[in-house]
């Protein structure tokens, strides 16, 4: 299990935990990021937002948000 912000470009996995406050929980739920969601990291540059693909949608999360999402990486 890894934090979303630790995954490299092209990594795929399933969200297994989200440790955030209720405001952020509401925001990410509204864009489809929930426990059990399958994601693919499109880009994860060092000082820019993480760009990922989830449920036919591209989503950008800043590093602080991404580090609060735990992902089970698929090989």
Segments from the language model and where they lie:
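A structural micro-motif recognizing beta-strand termini
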Residues: 18-21, 55
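Short alpha-helix capping/helix-loop boundary micro-motifs
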Residues: 23-27, 37
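Short, Lys/Arg- and Gly-enriched loop/turn segments at beta-strand edges
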Residues: 5, 25, 46-53
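A short glycine-leucine-enriched loop at secondary-structure breakpoints
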Residues: 31-32
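C-terminal structural segments of small proteins and small subunits
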Residues: 48-75
């Amino acid at each position: 299990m890894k934090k979303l912000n630790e995954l490299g470009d092209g990594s795929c996995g399933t969200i297994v935990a989200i440790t955030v406050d209720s405001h952020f929980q509401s925001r990410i739920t509204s864009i489809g990021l929930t426990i059990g969601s399958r994601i693919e990291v499109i880009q994860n540059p060092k000082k820019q937002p993480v760009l990922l693909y989830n449920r036919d949608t591209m989503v950008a999360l800043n590093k602080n948000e991404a580090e609060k999402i735990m992902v089970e990486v698929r090989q």
